[in-house]
Amino acid sequence: MTLAVPTASVAADDATDDEIRSSQQLNDGRTRALPPGDRWDEDRQATRRARALLQRMTLEEKVDMLHGEVNNYYGFYNAPIERLGIPALTMADGPAGTRIANPDVNGQRATQLPAPISLAATWDLALAEQYGDLAAEEAFSTGHNVLLAPAVDIARVAQAGRAFEAFGEDPLLSGTTGAAELRGIQSNPVVGDIKHYNVYTQEVNRLAGGNAVVDERALQEIYVRPFAIGVRDGRPGSAMCAFNKVNGTYACENDELLNTILKEQLRFQGWVMSDYGATHSTVRSILGGLDQEMPGSFTPDEEPGTCFFCGPLLEAVNAGEVPVSRINDAVLRILRPMFALGLFDMPPQIEPLPEA
């Protein structure tokens, strides 16, 4: 069963104490608002509970949700807000199975799944859904509640080192396979992350501002289409913007890509996180549609760097450069799928994985 991120907007003051009580307790694995395995009525409660919780957050707590950090235990990590019982976001890379960062967790071993490009070659959507389900089950059992998959990039450059992570050069096949994998991932209390948005087709200069120049028709018919299908049919809780520039503007601060196309045209309801080290500004990025900077104060080489969404974002809000309403929107986009997919009520576990 796949839990869809709700699109309804319900007033926060309609929320009852029972509906938000898990938000007021520490999410430590011992207190649950529902029995293990039960699902929230996502059409009625997720948005309402998210809005109610948002009202209880300070500005500093809201900004804390909008950037991550590198944590030795999880690798990719957003710290919990214990005062309100908001659980940590513990992320694992996962285009071809869960990548475990902590050597103490199952010896960093998980099932090595076939390359996604091979999965797409089967044209088997039921298999793609099983693929996502298995990857997410192992992510959850190794302490993670966000799986950074699937990648629906169009594979057009044979030399691209990560082409195997995508589903090939066909937009329809990429979108439908990615949507099926997302349904499998999110049948667990795990957020799927559709990536890398957009026109991320080669590795050369990817961290040095490589610029993809593309006209409107090609952008919409080739590069946007797999994301459109994935958002419509897979309902991902998150999306990841890419390293590269598109028509001269970094993807993670590109107003046309993130606001006009992804959030307005495609009606994407989740949150946009940056690829790891793909944020280059504070005000331009948050106003351009980026909701969460990852991994915060570390570069892709795990060296300390500038965190644009840490102190600088708080300063920009206090200076009037970024409206509080934009911060609220970004936080709500994170909280809503967290509620809808059960992250507040079914904490990930550390369990041995079965071995053949």
Outline where the language-model segments fall:
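C-terminal segment of classical bacterial N-terminal signal peptides
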Residues: 2-9
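Glycoside hydrolase catalytic-domain context in secreted enzymes
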Residues: 10-356
